[in-house]
């Protein structure tokens, strides 16, 4: 036992010395942004991981901005990081992508999503491919031509099931709903083989991405790796079964990836599993969180519910068959619904920051950011700018009527920006609009409890959101 303890102590001391020397031996000339690096190894990770009960920018970032200004340095999960809440700086960094900076995830998340393998050696080529295959199956054309009816059917089935229950915890229930829709699109009939609480495991992974990469029993990182391996095992079984019994000719997401494997050198079976893992996660987590926040905010603002219901009833009554399916033209006409979604995304900022990494020393605004440092662009701060949004802390969907497209483009970034605008943005909006149309025309809902915000590096709900759904007469 003492041998183990002494060994761990030696390891810690060695890492501490390495960490200190790393800063002392930095070979660059220039001025770093102001700030503090915190403790060895953990930096200031604990402060950012501490939940806040507000939708506002996290208190850790607010306090740092008040003390050091909108650009400051820190250390998160063992990585040196420059954090920026400066709009001009953030725009400049996004324009530098492919030149001075590249897309980046902190080491923990990179491990979870397989980005410490061959992916990073061909990041530009891989991103182009992932964007292409995602748009092919989840983009506007696919939604308009094929996918919208499946989203509508999934929403109707879920709401009918929820209406038979005395109470529904919306975050978990909606995560399962969206996950099933997404994997059915990705795997077709093989989606039935993905049993178990995979959405729950994915949510745990997201919650643990700021954890220190210490892989031994009891650590958050170890638990997340275990969940990751269990999910990947199920995905590998689906891929192997498809190859053994069907082949690559099925026209779903998996089928296209297997077919592309024959012509693209960087695509291997392991790459496909990591791709399926990443897209499965990305396709549901943000939608379910946004949907939960929408219902929380609607419960607090009945005047918004009234106008929302009026818009959807008008769409329904204008049909030849009021109970007929939603059309693409109807979706595009849901103006106020999209304003509600935009306002929720502005306040909620489900993903409140973007991460990049410098590939060379970068000089900007009088500072130097050394090669290899992470840059955290706090896009959520722009969503609270009173110069752009009057009374920015108030939920007001009507504000979007007066905002022009250029102002929105520069100051509203819920789906990323620059070269990395989310390929699934339209899918998210279509899903939310479709769900709200069915909800507003066929159901009433009552909040029973929960809804407490827990904002850390992600948005979550401390006690869920418990709702009773009742069919309209």
From Swiss-Prot:
Any one GO biological process: sterol metabolic process
EC number: 1.14.14.71, 1.14.14.-
First and last residue of the signal peptide: none
Record field: catalytic activity: cucurbitadienol + 2 reduced [NADPH--hemoprotein reductase] + 2 O2 = 11-oxocucurbitadienol + 2 oxidized [NADPH--hemoprotein reductase] + 3 H2O + 2 H(+); cucurbitadienol + reduced [NADPH--hemoprotein reductase] + O2 = 11-hydroxycucurbitadienol + oxidized [NADPH--hemoprotein reductase] + H2O + H(+); 11-hydroxycucurbitadienol + reduced [NADPH--hemoprotein reductase] + O2 = 11-oxocucurbitadienol + oxidized [NADPH--hemoprotein reductase] + 2 H2O + H(+); (24R)-24,25-dihydroxycucurbitadienol + reduced [NADPH--hemoprotein reductase] + O2 = mogrol + oxidized [NADPH--hemoprotein reductase] + H2O + H(+)
Membrane topology: Single-pass membrane protein
Alphabetized PROSITE patterns for the sequence: CYTOCHROME_P450 (PS00086)
MF terms (GO), sorted A to Z: heme binding; iron ion binding; oxidoreductase activity, acting on paired donors, with incorporation or reduction of molecular oxygen, reduced flavin or flavoprotein as one donor, and incorporation of one atom of oxygen
Top-rank lineage group of the source organism: Eukaryota
Enzyme class: oxidoreductase
Other information: Mogrosides, the major active constituents of S.grosvenorii fruits, are a mixture of cucurbitane-type triterpenoid glycosides that have been proven to be powerful and zero-caloric sweeteners and can hence be used as a sucrose substitute for diabetic and obese patients.
Family that this chain belongs to: Belongs to the cytochrome P450 family.
Biological role: Hydroxylase involved in the biosynthesis of cucurbitacin and mogroside tetracyclic triterpene natural products (e.g. siamenoside I and mogrosides IV, V and VI). Cucurbitacins have cytotoxic properties and exhibit deterrent taste as a defense barrier against herbivores. Mogrosides are nonsugar highly oxygenated compounds used as high-intensity zero-calorie sweeteners; they also possess pharmacological properties such as regulating immunity, lowering blood sugar and lipid levels, protecting the liver, and acting as antioxidants and antitumor agents.
Name of protein: Cucurbitadienol 11-hydroxylase
């Amino acid at each position: 036992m003492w041998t183990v303890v002494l060994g761990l102590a030696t390891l810690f001391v060695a890492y501490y010395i390495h960490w200190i020397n790393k800063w002392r031996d930095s070979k660059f000339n220039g001025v770093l942004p102001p700030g503090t690096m915190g403790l060895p190894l953990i930096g200031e990770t604990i402060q950012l991981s501490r939940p806040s009960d507000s939708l506002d920018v996290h208190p850790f970032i607010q306090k740092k901005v008040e003390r050091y200004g909108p650009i400051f340095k820190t250390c998160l999960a063992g990585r040196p990081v420059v954090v920026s809440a400066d709009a001009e700086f953030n725009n400049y960094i996004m324009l530098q992508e492919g030149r001075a900076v590249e897309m980046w995830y902190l080491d923990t998340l990179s491990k979870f999503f397989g980005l410490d393998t061959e992916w990073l050696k061909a990041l530009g080529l891989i991103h182009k491919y992932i964007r292409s295959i995602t748009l092919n199956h989840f983009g506007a054309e696919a939604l308009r031509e094929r996918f919208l009816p499946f989203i509508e059917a999934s929403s109707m089935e879920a709401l009918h099931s929820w209406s038979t229950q005395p109470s529904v915890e919306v975050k978990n229930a909606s995560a399962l709903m969206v996950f099933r829709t997404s994997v059915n699109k990705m795997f077709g009939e093989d989606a039935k083989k993905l049993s178990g609480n995979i959405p729950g495991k994915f949510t745990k992974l997201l919650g643990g991405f700021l954890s220190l990469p210490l892989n031994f029993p009891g650590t958050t990182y170890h638990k997340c790796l275990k969940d990751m391996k269990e999910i990947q095992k199920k995905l590998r079984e689906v891929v192997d079964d498809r190859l053994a019994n069907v082949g690559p000719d099925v026209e779903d997401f998996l089928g296209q990836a297997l077919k592309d494997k024959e012509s693209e050198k960087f695509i291997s079976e392991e790459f496909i599993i990591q791709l399926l893992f990443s897209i499965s996660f990305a396709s549901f987590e943000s939608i379910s969180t946004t949907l939960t926040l929408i219902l929380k905010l609607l419960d607090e603002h009945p005047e918004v519910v009234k106008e929302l219901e009026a818009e959807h009833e008008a769409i329904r009554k204008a049909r030849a068959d009021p109970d007929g399916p939603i059309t693409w033209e109807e979706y595009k006409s849901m103006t106020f619904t999209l304003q509600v979604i935009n306002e929720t995304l502005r306040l909620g900022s489900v993903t409140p920051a973007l991460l990049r990494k410098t590939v060379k020393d970068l000089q900007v605004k009088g500072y130097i950011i050394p090669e290899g440092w992470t840059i955290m662009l706090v896009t959520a701060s722009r969503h609270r700018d009173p110069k752009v949004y009057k009374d920015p802390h108030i939920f007001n969907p009507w504000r979007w009527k007066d905002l022009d497209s250029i102002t929105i483009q520069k100051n509203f970034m819920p789906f990323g920006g620059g070269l990395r605008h989310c390929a699934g943005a339209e899918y998210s909006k279509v899903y939310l609009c479709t769900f709200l149309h069915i909800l507003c025309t066929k159901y009433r809902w009552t909040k029973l409890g929960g809804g407490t915000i827990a904002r850390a590096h992600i948005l979550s709900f401390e006690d869920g959101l418990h709702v009773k759904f009742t069919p309209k007469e």
